[in-house]
Amino acid sequence: MRIILLGPPGAGKGTQAVGIVEKYNIPHISTGDIFRKNIKEGTELGKKAKEYMDQGLLVPDELTVGLVTDRISQEDCKNGFMLDGFPRNVAQGEHLDIFLKNAGISLDKVVNIEVDKSILVSRAVGRRICKSCGATYHVEFNPPKVEGVCDVCQGELYQRADDNEETVSKRIQVYLDETKPLVDYYSKQGIIADIKGDQAIDKVFEDIVAALGSGK
């Protein structure tokens, strides 16, 4: 099963990704993780990526594609993988298609988690994180038993500086401008599965599994 997971910031991709990789026994491939690993190991691609990141610049498509295709060429991806955070735009999607075609394989499904912008903003603005253990809460949807105190370790909860309405709205707009066109791109290939992400977590996962089927 070869899957791409799409969805705006705050759509719950991280939560659903855990369930997907467990159910289908495939590696979870995140571009952020790939960048960090290559930089840490000092690979040639990692060094090039670090040069851009140190300057606060976006890593060019060509370099990002190189890192991802290198990762999905590895043995543990032989029977499938789930891409999260890639492709970010249609150009990256086209590069990926060329690579997969040359490798004699194809994508099975692109899971697109859809959530209304107002809900995405509400989710992010209400998020609270434990300073000690990193547990995540939400003032409305998943509040701690005691306000401002972590249920797990009794650590102090805080709000991330970028979890404000203005910053979150900008992140969503970047997604809409850059990544949303991928939905049309994959729709034309007939492999998109639109999933309503404003439902209960279990229901969202149930819908994803129904769209993916039994796997290969």
UniProtKB/Swiss-Prot annotation:
Per its record, what are the GO molecular function terms?
adenylate kinase activity; ATP binding; zinc ion binding
Q: Where does Zn(2+) bind?
A: 130, 133, 150, 153
What this protein catalyses is: AMP + ATP = 2 ADP
Which keywords belong to this entry?
ATP-binding, Cytoplasm, Kinase, Metal-binding, Nucleotide biosynthesis, Nucleotide-binding, Transferase, Zinc
Q: Name one GO biological process term.
A: AMP salvage
Question: Which of this chain's residues are annotated to bind AMP?
Answer: 31, 36, 57-59, 85-88, 92, 160, 171
Q: What is its EC number?
A: 2.7.4.3
Stretch list, region NMP: 30-59
Amino acids binding ATP = 10-15, 127, 136-137, 199
Gene Ontology CC: cytoplasm
For region LID, the annotated ranges are 126-163
Q: In which pathway does it act?
A: Purine metabolism; AMP biosynthesis via salvage pathway; AMP from ADP: step 1/1
Q: Where in the cell is it found?
A: Cytoplasm
| Superkingdom classification of source | Bacteria
State the InterPro entries in the record. Answer: Adenyl_kin_sub, Adenylat/UMP-CMP_kin, Adenylat_kinase_CS, Adenylate_kinase_lid-dom, P-loop_NTPase
Enzyme class, broadest EC rank: transferase
Give the family from UniProt.
Belongs to the adenylate kinase family.
Q: Please quote what the entry notes about the protein's domains.
A: Consists of three domains, a large central CORE domain and two small peripheral domains, NMPbind and LID, which undergo movements during catalysis. The LID domain closes over the site of phosphoryl transfer upon ATP binding. Assembling and dissambling the active center during each catalytic cycle provides an effective means to prevent ATP hydrolysis. Some bacteria have evolved a zinc-coordinating structure that stabilizes the LID domain.
- UniProt xrefs under PANTHER family: NUCLEOTIDE KINASE
Assembly and interaction partners? Monomer.
Q: What does this protein do?
A: Catalyzes the reversible transfer of the terminal phosphate group between ATP and AMP. Plays an important role in cellular energy homeostasis and in adenine nucleotide metabolism.
What is the name attached to this protein's record?
Adenylate kinase
**Natural source organism:** Clostridioides difficile (strain 630)
